[in-house]
Amino acid sequence: MSRLGSRRGSRRASIDPLRLIPMDKAKAPAAGEDFNVVFIGAGNIMFGSPEGPWNHSFRFEHKLGPRLKVVALIDPALDRAAAALQKKRDSFVLSAYQDTKMYKTIDDFARSMTPEEKPRAIIVGSPPHWRGTDLPGRDLELKLLQYFPGVALFVEKPVSTGPYTTALDIAKKIEAAGNLCSVGYMLRYLKAVQMMKQIIEDKELVVMATSARYVCAYEAITKPDWWDKSRDQGPVIEQGTHFCDLSRYFGGDVDISSVMAHSVEWDEEPGHLSKIGVDESKIAPENRIPRVTTATWKYENGAVGTLTHAVSLHGKNYSCELEVYLDGYQMRLVDPYHIPTLYIRRPGDDYEETYRFGDDDPFFSEASRCFQLD
């Protein structure tokens, strides 16, 4: 592998951090023709939750302004969809939702769609159990390619809870079809992350090691499926893949044969938790989630990586860090979900420079760039 290939890691070039504008400082949306969007899923990821800052509808409303027209909201729970729509219609974004139609399935919408309702983008926020495979009822992406050729897709992570080989096949089919597709790993869009990436490119550095730590505050997590491995596949899939993706963004592709992992299980003494917000006794013992997972691996270029995910904190705030090591450099990203802070130690000095990005919103930056809406 060339030094350039090693340096780029994920092969994605950096974005100038100065171009990542906070939502409250962005220019007013430019006038233009309607931008039709379909929302799939009427849950927390699409319409917000006290648990965290995710809320895709909010970001697209502010990015597109009066151009946004949500032509369809797809969710089998029509009562939940209706409640979400009513809140929007009672607010300042009425124009985006006043003509929104509700459907239980994407098939229902495709059958009734008029030419005027054809979407330019589809936002997928449904649970991963129902997508990412080629099995009937769990083959959403394949149906989207069939019904909406060429339409841009935004798919929330995780992309699948099925076999990873099948998920890779689905990804190849999306690429072959030519649909622009973005996945909701928004931490790549942090100004701090792009500053790290820019330094690596400008100094022509090669990553030696990455070390990721993701410790969640579990007390506020009250969705039963989250605690059930048979439903949401556990916290590494639900949360830890954010840092797996970020690690790959710097280190590049992983030698899968080198991955080793250990975990603290629910029935081991260190795995006792005192403030679980669901009745775990209703979950089969074999489906209860691990409390701590650690993994190590080698990247294909020879660098090494580690990940620790823990379900251990009370309160609301998570404790998350990513460290990247290079010749002469240590870069430490701290608290990426709240006030992203970057600590940099450079060659020839023991001092750590500190950069805080209190006004950053990677969700908005992602929404702005994934469909080239600038």
Question: Where are these predicted regions, by residue range?
Answer:
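Conserved acidic residues
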Residues: V71, R120, M208
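Short amphipathic alpha-helix with an adjacent loop that forms part of the alpha/beta core around
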Residues: I106-P119
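Beta-strand-loop-alpha-helix segment that lines the small-molecule cofactor/substrate pocket
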Residues: A121, P127-R188
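NAD(P)-dinucleotide binding in Rossmann-like oxidoreductases
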Residues: A284-P290, E300-R369, L373
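A contiguous active-site-proximal alpha/beta segment in oxidoreductase catalytic domains
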Residues: S160-P224, Q233, F243
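N-terminal Rossmann-like dinucleotide-binding module
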Residues: S2-F92
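Short acidic-hydrophobic, aromatic-tinged amphipathic segments that line or gate anion-handling sites
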Residues: L94-D108
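Rossmann-like dinucleotide-binding domain that binds NAD(P)(H)
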Residues: P224-K316
